[in-house]
Amino acid sequence: MKLEKVIIKNRKGQGIVVLLEIAPDQKGLAFVMHGLGGYKEQPHVEVFAKAFLDNNYSVIRFDTTNTFGESDGNYEDATISNYYEDLEDVIEWAKNQEWYQEPFCLAGHSLGGICISLYAQKYPENVKALAPISSVVSGKLSLETKDKEHFDEWKKTGYRIKESSSKPGLMKKLKWSHISDRLKYDLI
């Protein structure tokens, strides 16, 4: 299986780095999406991709903008809205490729999980299977995962700063606008 890296532009003109693994005897197509602050080569994202590759599915992985991968943007500006738009833009680009086929599979971790679920709600005819893994399901429920003081401090300072678990030594600084955007979404 050949691995190819391409750079496409999203609707905002930002570069999105995409990894293509096209199966020689393609039985289907899968888009695999990372979570907040993730990237396309994270070990668990590679495991998701391998499950499809082992079954002769071509796999498209990409770094959303505003993450720690190779695509444009800054992590502090990350939102569900921008991750979702990047997913739509990657799929729209893929529609013009010779290996594209519908319906396709979608797999996503955490924030990627809510994005693929939102896509499936909007375009159910395009989706054969959906695999949201440890998915965000509701902005409102997200606020219940930590105590009120945590979010009060975040809102007051405008940022949440913490060390990355996927890239040790890297500090993640995320704007409060991430929460404001997250509250717009609810799969329940």
Segment roles from a protein language model:
Residues 27-35:
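Short beta-strand element of the alpha/beta-hydrolase
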Residues 1-25:
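N-terminal cap/lid segment of alpha/beta-hydrolase-fold proteins
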